[in-house]
Structures are given as structure tokens and as C-alpha cells.
Amino acid sequence: MSAELKHLVQRFYDEVLNAGQLNVLDELLTPNAIYRNPALGLPASVEGAKQRLAGLRSAFPDLRYTVENITAEGDRVVVQFVLEGTQHGEFLGIAPTGKTVRTLGMTSYRFTDGRIAEILVLADFVTVLRQLGVLPVLTATPP
């Protein structure tokens, strides 16, 4: 079962996040699935997830997720990923900068009856905001 769940999550990355095929969500997610990404706002339904992911793709048209690690246990799969993209559209109210961002994140997936019922994304958006020039870059100072 773990191999099957990992395969479904890999499809989520390959087909939905990297290829932008949002219609695949209808196949991979339960009808009442919840998508939570605190950086992008309140929890969303399947349709809300499609809108948020489309907005992210609009802001970063070359957006690319690379799965660094994938672990499955019972009805859960956890992924560690690297996200990279260049901002060519508005993102969280920030006008396009043309800057490329790279950050790390983790996502937890909970399955019900072989489909994703819940997604929780935790990504380092502070680093993204620094790379976009919205927040100052912290530098170490000698003691």
C-alpha cells in the first residue's frame, strides 16, 4: 500500500504541480478533500486548491518542485521538496520582480480509500519573500 500511495503523491508533483494539469486533482483527491497551505490563506476545497495552484503558477510560470524525500506510513505520505521559480506575475500582492526563488518545504498527505483527503503544505515563504526583496536578508555579525 505504501508504494501505491507514494506513486499517487509523485503523480501529484509531476502532473499537477510541475505540469499544471489541475484537472488531475479530480482524480487524485476525494471530493471533500481539504488543501491547507497557511502561507496562501485559509483551508481550501478541491476547487479552492485549483484556484490557489493556478495563482501560484501564474505568478511563477516556470515553477518546479523537486521531490527530495518521500516517506509513507499507514494512510500518510510526507514529502520534503525544493521549490524553484521566477516571479513574472503578482504573488501575495507583490508586483512581478523577475527574480528567481528557491526554497524548501514539506507536505503531509492523508489518504482515504486510495485518494488524497487532506494536504498540509509547510514551505519556507520567509526565504521566498527575502529572495523577492520584500524582507531584508539576515546576515551574521561577528561576536
Segments predicted by a language model, with ranges:
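C-terminal and inter-domain tail/linker signature
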Residues: 1-143
